[in-house]
Amino acid sequence: MNEAVSPGALSTLFTDARTHNGWRETPVSDETLREIYALMKWGPTSANCSPARIVFIRTAEGKERLRPALSSGNLQKTLTAPVTAIVAWDSEFYERLPQLFPHGDARSWFTSSPQLAEETAFRNSSMQAAYLIVACRALGLDTGPMSGFDRQHVDDAFFAGSTLKSNLLINIGYGDSSKLFARLPRLSFEEACGLL
């Protein structure tokens, strides 16, 4: 049986963690980005399909390629973030299933149903984006996930000629707490959950 993590860890991962819009000028190393992936890759996905593909944008040149795709409200916080991750999904993720799920012919589940393949890739890459956020928090980083961007522009600018399609963006760095908004409420258990 697994042991519960400490209250301090729960605070870091969930209750005290915030979505950041402003950033300190502290760089995030490539080694730290590798550590993030080394943690997030263990999060569960359907048939271990692991459809997420991540581009970590760290350079001014990369940010300029991204700039035209950003909504006005997301522009400044993205350009000043040390790293912006494009979380994409591979529309042909199933080609890796003989490696990732060798227990049966899982590839055929998806080659026979393009709709199932797309739904699976999008849903599971979204789950993997959440794992990335938790991994960042576990390593002492802050994040700012965003869906306010032009997906087609991102796909054309970064994934043209490939099987990748963008899902969401996540700014990563060390947040400037002086730029946080007041914490917003969440739904109560009674409002969001049911017991049968």
From Swiss-Prot:
Its EC number is 1.1.1.298. One of its GO terms (biological process) is nitrogen utilization. It catalyses: 3-hydroxypropanoate + NADP(+) = 3-oxopropanoate + NADPH + H(+). InterPro entries: Nitroreductase, Nitroreductase-like, Nitroreductase_HadB/RutE, RutE-like. GO terms for molecular function: 3-hydroxypropionate dehydrogenase (NADP+) activity. It comes from the Bacteria. Keywords: Flavoprotein, FMN, NAD, NADP, Oxidoreductase. Induction: Up-regulated by the nitrogen regulatory protein C (NtrC also called GlnG) and repressed by RutR. Pfam families: Nitroreductase. Its cofactor is FMN. PANTHER family: MALONIC SEMIALDEHYDE REDUCTASE RUTE-RELATED. HAMAP family: Oxidoreductase_RutE_HadB. May reduce toxic product malonic semialdehyde to 3-hydroxypropionic acid, which is excreted. Belongs to the nitroreductase family. HadB/RutE subfamily. This is Probable malonic semialdehyde reductase RutE. It comes from Escherichia coli O8 (strain IAI1). The gene is rutE.
